[in-house]
Amino acid sequence: MELNNIEIQKIIPHRYPFLLVDKMVEVELGKRGVGIKNVTANEPFFQGHFPGNPIMPGVLMTEALAQVAALICMGLEENKGKLGVFTGIDKCKFRRQVVPGDVLRLEIEMTALRRGIGKAEGKAYVGEELACSASLTFALINPNTDK
């Protein structure tokens, strides 16, 4: 299954400038997925990171991976309307700078999804080069009652 940007926005609540997944090219709900982020010179974070030498902040690469994980989990019928929130990031490594013009391929493999807690392994690539890898943990909460 693939998802375009409009379909993505029906599943997760993120919006510009914080929606960091342009499309999903592979989706296996509850299991795995591959998303794409086209990094442009117009990204708002490049204004201050860094003027004259724009580099995508590493924390936004991990957030993009988390958004792919959220799409995989929140697309399941039992998770519709829930909100995915980070509970942990482990073994995070940044191996390559991501700059304007790069296409970031965001790969997520779910390792656990039980009782509203998800765990996933994420990797972000530019071409065949690994840019970022991390183990992500998150909770799926009801935004109206869980705080």
Curated annotation (Swiss-Prot):
Chief location: cytoplasm
Subcellular location: Cytoplasm
Assigned EC number: 4.2.1.59
SUPFAM superfamilies cross-referenced by the UniProt entry: Thioesterase/thiol ester dehydrase-isomerase (SSF54637)
Catalytic reaction(s) noted: a (3R)-hydroxyacyl-[ACP] = a (2E)-enoyl-[ACP] + H2O
Pfam family, one: FabA
Active-site residues from the entry: H49
Function: Involved in unsaturated fatty acids biosynthesis. Catalyzes the dehydration of short chain beta-hydroxyacyl-ACPs and long chain saturated and unsaturated beta-hydroxyacyl-ACPs.
Family from the record: Belongs to the thioester dehydratase family. FabZ subfamily.
Name of the protein: 3-hydroxyacyl-[acyl-carrier-protein] dehydratase FabZ
UniProt source species: Alkaliphilus metalliredigens (strain QYMF)
